[in-house]
From Swiss-Prot:
GO terms for molecular function: metallopeptidase activity. This is Uncharacterized protein MJ0231. PANTHER family: METALLOPROTEASE PMBA (PTHR43421:SF1). GO terms for biological process: proteolysis. The lineage of its organism: Archaea, Methanobacteriati, Methanobacteriota, Methanomada group, Methanococci. One of its GO terms (cellular component) is cytosol. InterPro entries: Metalloprtase-TldD/E_C, Metalloprtase-TldD/E_cen_dom, Metalloprtase-TldD/E_N, PmbA, TldD/PmbA_N, TldD/PmbA_sf. It comes from Methanocaldococcus jannaschii (strain ATCC 43067 / DSM 2661 / JAL-1 / JCM 10045 / NBRC 100440).
Amino acid sequence: MDLEKLIKIGEKEGFETEVLFVKSYEVSVDLDGKSVDSFQTGISYGIGVRVIKDGKVGFAYANKFDENIVYKAMKNLVEDKYTEFAHPQKYKEPKGMFYKEILDLDEEKLLEDLITMRDIALDNNAIVLSGGVSKEVGYARLINSNGVDVEEQDTYFSAAISIMYDGETSYECRTRHNIFDVEEISYRALDLAKKSANGKAISYKGNIVLSPRALYDLLSYTLMPAFSAENVQRDRSVLKGKIGEQIFGENITIIDDGTLDYALYSSKCDGEGTATQKTVLVENGVLKNYLYDIKRANREGKTSTGNASRGYRSLPYVSPTNFIIKETKNSLDDFDEYVYINGVIGSHTSNPITGDFAVEIQNSYYYKNGKIIPIKRGMFGGNIFEMFKEAIPLNDVEQRGKLISPSVVFKGEIIN
């Protein structure tokens, strides 16, 4: 595919031009209850074009190669004096992004893994509600008039299962760049359901422990957006104007790192061709930085942190890569009493500006002096920014979506 031809068309008309080509191939097999539902295979690809001239930016996209896409972008101009295209730079390629084993993985192996997960659940007297195993291979190439020409290829393997045990439902999933043992997914789902089955209505005030999964669901709608320079500049972040201030407890260090080996959201560059980097956001509770793309950085006379995210159908926007909450030496064994929350429902209703939230807890239990009591679904609410002032990260780190974090202990209240 001659992407360079699109650049030449734009330049001939006096426009700086950028072309993003994205392609992905996915194979999945799913369960409907305990029965194998269907195999699905999908190929998707598309091209996004941006053009710049005289302080105006145009954008258009198509799901096939079409020279007219450049002319369409030229007709969609809007005033934008801050957007620029990236310049050539050195890129660090993170390890563990692409595995040939995923390319060679056939439908029979996917089905075998799915049946393995299902049978583990059935053999342990659980009802299987749904499940799935999939592989994906992705490719992207970005070129522009400044001479940037960068491409990346990555692979993904995912497995998930939803079960019911003794009246309690649970769900477990995992995505990695390479193949992993799917048996653990079923065993973790069973463990979640067993620990929270036959729950009691308990109200509690004290140590609230959020698992990495529950944290990701909650922080995606509260904490993470607050570090976006786009939100800061639009007065949609409580962190505006607080660089250098103590915003959290000294236990809290948060880093955004798009260069981390083997992590799910690492890459050579962001959606604009800017090299990814490691950005310290909070150090020992002190706010150090925000996250930027080129446009938002230019507004403040700064440099992009490599946090532009986009697909071929969208313009760049600021987003975290791997959002890391640093662990401590603390563990659950250090606490005699707490409520452990494995999942939450309703995070999307949180206020991303203030950090206020109220969620329903799921697969949770009360622990005191070695005794575990399952909890019926209760409500947990508060303000995420206030809670992080007394938060204690533990040492059980795992990646859930964009979040790499241990479980974190907060002060809070469960209402039933």
